[in-house]
UniProtKB/Swiss-Prot annotation:
Any single Pfam family the record assigns to this protein: THDPS_N_2
Alphabetical list of HAMAP family matching this protein: DapD (MF_00811)
Top-level taxon of origin: Bacteria
Alphabetized InterPro entries for the sequence: DapD_Trfase_Hexpep_rpt_fam, Hexapep, Hexapep_transf_CS, THP_succinylTrfase_dom1, THP_succinylTrfase_N_sf, Trimer_LpxA-like_sf
Annotated protein name in UniProt: 2,3,4,5-tetrahydropyridine-2,6-dicarboxylate N-succinyltransferase
Source organism of this protein record: Cereibacter sphaeroides (strain ATCC 17029 / ATH 2.4.9)
Enzyme kind, highest EC tier: transferase
This protein's UniProt keywords: Acyltransferase, Amino-acid biosynthesis, Cytoplasm, Diaminopimelate biosynthesis, Lysine biosynthesis, Repeat, Transferase
Reaction(s) this enzyme catalyzes, per UniProt: (S)-2,3,4,5-tetrahydrodipicolinate + succinyl-CoA + H2O = (S)-2-succinylamino-6-oxoheptanedioate + CoA
GO CC, alphabetical: cytoplasm
Subcellular location: Cytoplasm
NCBIfam families for the chain: dapD (TIGR00965), PRK11830.1 (NF008808)
Length: 274
């Protein structure tokens, strides 16, 4: 089935979603399963870059949500001390053997979790971390210990998600775009990027930077305040701005801009020094 045919079938299924159950068969089930398989293999993405802009395939997000209706809850094996879990989404690695691992070409350290329909590209390293369904993690990216990649999040090439980083998931509301980290970004430990925000290519976020749609992102040099997007090549640290009543409120501060040449010659710690 072509992607245009899949899209039409998913849109029709979405309109009749209340009728979809684990007993559903035929074109509806086939379209949902084919879409989830395409996401899992990386041939389809929830969002794709076209020029400088990101286009969201809302129908692919709908397929992810519809997938929950096709399965009942069931025992998931593999827990500590022969324990189990109770869920309706399979592991990406279910029934994988040596051949599948070699073909996939990424490294998955014990106790990392990746749910089916998430794509992991070649050269990725997954420390004990969590990658949710519909996400896309591109080549040679490091997902460090306790980092979380939320549902449908898009992570670029050569990205470093440091320990404890949270990249937010966006399945609902349906019109919302996914959280996006573009190529060659460094996200410092325990930072959070959520609510469909975009960190543009080559940016560096220091430790403990939190960015949501309502977070002020302040360019220290120009005084410009922006929301929802970190410009390419930005070096960002946590800061604060004066507010009413003499109280300072949190913001993210762009302390400098760097190009790829500077990044290649300068350590992350040097970039973050004020």
């Amino acid at each position: 089935m072509s992607y245009s045919a899949l899209e039409a079938a998913i849109e029709a299924a979405w309109e009749a979603r209340e009728t979809i159950t684990p007993a559903t068969k035929g074109e509806t089930r086939e379209a949902i399963e084919a879409t989830l398989e395409a996401l899992d293999k990386g041939s389809l993405r929830v969002a794709e870059k076209r020029g400088a802009d990101w286009h969201v395939n809302q129908w692919a997000k709908k397929a992810v949500l519809l997938g929950f209706r096709l399965k009942d809850m069931e025992v998931q094996t593999g827990g500590p001390q022969a324990g189990t879990w109770w869920d309706k989404v399979d592991s990406k690695f279910a029934q994988w053997g040596e051949a599948q691992w070699k073909a996939a070409g990424f490294r998955a350290v014990p106790n990392c979790i990746v749910r089916r329909s998430a794509y992991i590209a070649r050269g990725v390293v997954l420390m004990p971390s969590f990658v949710n369904l519909g996400a896309y993690v591109d080549e040679s990216t490091m997902v460090d210990t306790w980092a979380t990649v939320g549902s449908c999040a898009q992570i670029g090439k050569n990205v470093h998600l440091s320990g404890g980083v949270g990249i937010g998931g966006v399945l609902e509301p349906m019109q919302a775009g996914p959280t996006i980290i573009e190529d060659n970004c460094f996200i410092g430990a325990r930072s959070e990027v959520v609510e469909g925000c975009i960190v543009r290519e080559g940016s560096v976020l220091g430790m403990g930077v939190f960015i949501g749609k309502s977070t002020k992102i302040v360019d220290r040099e120009t005084g410009e305040v922006m929301y929802g997007e970190v410009p390419a090549g930005s070096v960002v640290v946590a800061g604060s701005m004066p507010s009413k009543g003499g109280v300072n409120l949190y913001c993210a501060v762009i302390v400098k801009r760097v190009d790829a040449q500077t990044r290649s010659k300068t350590s992350i710690n040097e970039l973050l020094r004020d």
